[in-house]
Amino acid sequence: MPVTDSNNRLKVGVFGIGLDAYWPQFQGLEQRLRGYTEQVAGRLERSGVQVVNLGLIDTPEKALTAGHEFRRADVDLIFLYVTTYALSSTVLPVVRRAKVPVIILNLSPAAAIDYAAFNRLGDRTKMTGEWLAFCQACPVPEIANVFKRCRIPFFQVTGMLENDPLAWTEIAEWIDAARVAHIMEHNRLGVMGHYYGGMLDIYSDLTQQCAYFGGHVEILEVEALAALRREVREPEVKKRVAVFHQSMDVQPDCPPEELERAARTSLALDRLVETHKLGSLAYYHQGTGNPENEDVINSIILGTSLLTARGIPVAGEYEIKNAQAMKIMDSFGAGGSFTEYYAVDYNDDVVLMGHDGPGHLTISEGKTKVRPLTVYHGKLGRGLSVEMSVKRGPVTLLSVVQTVDGRLQLLVAEGESVAGPILEIGNTNSRYRFSIGARRFMNEWNTHGPAHHCAVGVGHLSGKLKKLAGLLGMDCIHVG
């Protein structure tokens, strides 16, 4: 569930660094650099983010105090603005105690010093003070050296304080990535049922997921959903069927009794999510002949699609890694729909990808269709399913990959959702084109050993995903 509690917002720390020995030597320098620091802090402000601004730190003593303040404030990320040369001893105590990633801002107040005006000053003390106001780059190697030796994760943005869209886009992406990391840290992932037997690639280490992403995993029983379904009343069912018609393109051959069956399960799912405060869900259930449980699972797709559209992504086949990937994509505002290879169109050089089960209604090209299926291929029973293509335009694929040495990494590819014929079989189904071509894309993607499912979202997000991986201590591999 997206983090909306005002007490649980992303907290971003910011401080500038300087050298107290300069202030009596160069008139106005301290005030000027404090002004730059306030300017940076102001530009970090945005909805859903609390900025903790500690101003200009210029002594080791102030640095130690700042470290305690950041820790008390529980900041998720620190922006270190280098205003001029400063001793690394005024930096280390701040970030060492906070124990969060650091973004070093090496931002000059202008594109270049006005050399002619500078050299006309005539007073070498004034000239030195002016130079020091442009001396942001000077201490960065010193700081980086110390951070490396202290194993403090850090990243850099280099550019200008003003008139530099590239630098400020980078900064915005760091905030966005930190916001998603914060959401994952507080996410409650429900897992209901069991794995699809024999799909060895999707078996996951839940402790490993918590180690990297944080959050909580809630183990759920299908019987709990069935019990909630028994409590649903007829008037609620009629209203939910109306919601189906409003939010999806229900095809004429969908039997009314199937829509009502799906509505009951959808309402029960909502209650399950609310009871356990879930932000995402992975599920699968084969069953042993219990009619009530089978009835629930066979009618789950419309309800899980509605949840996915609400920012509570649902992954079928108990695909926990992909539930995480879908939550990441949705938290970036890109959607995050469950998908896998379907086929290849070598004539058009596109990869067809889709899946049965939930689709992400908000990233559909047009209204998502609801179709009846007399069989769920490879699964139990029959019922209603959704058919959609992802919106035309740029897309990003994301897989959370478990490596042989017990680590997690993000695997990313950018492509384009293109128009053309699809398989009208009541599944999500899209055509994706990649700059490196369909053959090379598949070979390179598969080489990294992801599970056969991945999440697809709209827009190109590789820059943000790389930053998220950095904040989480993961590698990020970009295919293409």
Where are these regions (language model features)?
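Cap/lid and interdomain-hinge subdomains that line or gate substrate/regulatory clefts
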Residues: 2-5, 9-12, 51, 111-241, ...
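Short catalytic helix/loop segments, enriched in acidic residues and glycine
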Residues: 29-45
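Short, well-structured alpha-helical segments in soluble
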Residues: 63-75, 94, 266-275
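Periplasmic-binding protein-like
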Residues: 75-84, 103-106, 278-284
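Short, acidic/small-residue loops that bind anionic groups at enzyme active sites
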Residues: 93-120, 125-137, 303-317
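Long, internal scaffold/assembly segments composed of regular secondary structure
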Residues: 238-332
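C-terminal catalytic subdomain
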Residues: 307-424
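Extended hydrophobic packing segments that form well-structured cores
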Residues: 379-480
